[in-house]
Amino acid sequence: MSKEQEVAVIHPEGERELVVVGGPNQGSTVDTYGGSIHVKWDETAAVTPFGQLAFFIEFLKTAGLWDGWVQECPVTYESPNAPAKTDVLGTILLSVLAGHRRYAHITALRFDGVNPQLLGMTKVCSEDSVRRAFSAVDQAECMAWLTRHLRISYEPLLSESWILDIDSTVKPLYGHQEGAVKGYNPGKPGRPSHVYHTYFAATVRLVLDVEVQAGNQTASSYAQPEFWNYIDSLPAEARPAFVRGDCDWGTERMMAAAEERKILYLFKLKQRSKVKQLIEQAFSRQDWVSAGQGWKGVEAELMLTGWSRQRRVIVLRRRILDERLLAEKKRLADTTPDRQLALGFVEIVKDGPLYEYAVLVTSLPDEILSLGQHYRDRADAENNFDELKNQWGWSGFTTHDLKRCQIMARTIALIYNWWSLFTRLAIPEKHAEAITSRPLLLNAVGKQTTHSGQTTVTVTSMHAKAPRMRSALPAIGSFLATVRNAAEQLTYPQKWLLILSRVFCHFLKGRILGQPQFVPGTG
């Protein structure tokens, strides 16, 4: 054996490459109850799990909502390798629409081969790029940007008579975030949290604004400065018919501020000693009248300690017929003593019936029947929180600083408003929560193909109501095309006016909304 051959044997040319049998390119054979099948992976196909998103993108483009939001975004980059604003905001939009709750969930979107380019994006950003995007931005500038676009989403509606619901919700936290303080947290007592003070347009279920504060600032007194700044920014013709809230908002400071501005209100009162005395006095009255749904009510005047004046109050009561319901409500009252339950007070008379009571304070002139219904309608605010926290991401997207938590809360609220308005074009008679509207109007397998310069997205929906949507979604597209083609001379705010009039045709009965004057539009 020659020396060259000996060297070749002693020092082989590295390890041989392993030949993988049944790798990703070759596929895999799987034994199923339907027989053996061959599974292959295709990493290059232009497919998406959100095949119907193109209709929503057309909605945003026709109204000018997406372009205005991206162009006015205060995020700036100096590095030539930094992502474009369109890519960052587009990634956030896709993630929120998909129902994600954490930045890490963005990874699931990285290989969507259809929708990013429909939004004008060049790529889907990583979770780190999205998380860091707003870290250096000026907070005041960013808040003004988001507040402005939130108002654009609903401003024409304020020319109609509307009700403002105010409420707060707690977001439990599990780290060392700024503002993560122990406070009122009925779901997880002792757990640090943030609190979201939120204003809603009742019935239409749109978010007007949201403010994120530390977990020990759940009281309405912490939210009132920003709330009254918001109210004062509206002209008289755009202010709500009345403001509605639970017992946290029925305070002297809140009611006096409303009276000073000549804004009507309806609040529930905490059942402290003088309120309970009023209930006891009302028990023997004979002038109880129907308040709807089994409730009866009487009217009285009340001036609590610390109040500047006497105010009209309505005492409501409902007979308790189900002993099991009574036991459950008593258990909840014992375990969460600070919680204002529907059973705020139970009057027990020997050998007599049991009643649950609620006391409302109001400046409205309405009769008791209407006031009782008004307050029961406030339960919709709780449904809003349930949807936004459990279906839209208000329970997540948390960072160490409070600023970015506030930015994401308003961003999610804006996207929620956009999607809610879009879904009403398909389902005008009611609000469809995301758990219903996403499978119906968003989720579907979409495959994109291009031939002779024509791009086609083939959609396959597995929903039982897919045939209905196959006619509803193209009808929305036809309407938007009419707005674009027949109203070329109109500005974006004017087009948005027409679109909102169609969105709320069920409420407006065919009327066109009046032109808003108090928020300047883009166009």
Regions found by a protein language model. Name each.
Residues 240-250:
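Acidic/histidine-rich, metal-coordinating catalytic segments
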Residues 106, 368-411, 415-419:
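Short amphipathic alpha-helical "interface-anchor" segments enriched in bulky aromatics
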Residues 2-191, 195-217, 221-236, 423, ...:
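Dynamic "connector" segments at or just before major functional cores
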Residues 2-12, 24-35, 39, 264-390, ...:
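An anionic, glycine-rich sequence signature occurring as long contiguous blocks
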Residues 78-87, 187, 350-351, 399-408:
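Structural motif
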Residues 395-458, 462-463:
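Basic, amphipathic alpha-helical segments enriched in Lys/Arg and hydrophobic/aromatic residues
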Residues 255-264:
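Short, surface-exposed basic-aromatic patches at helix termini and helix-loop junctions that form
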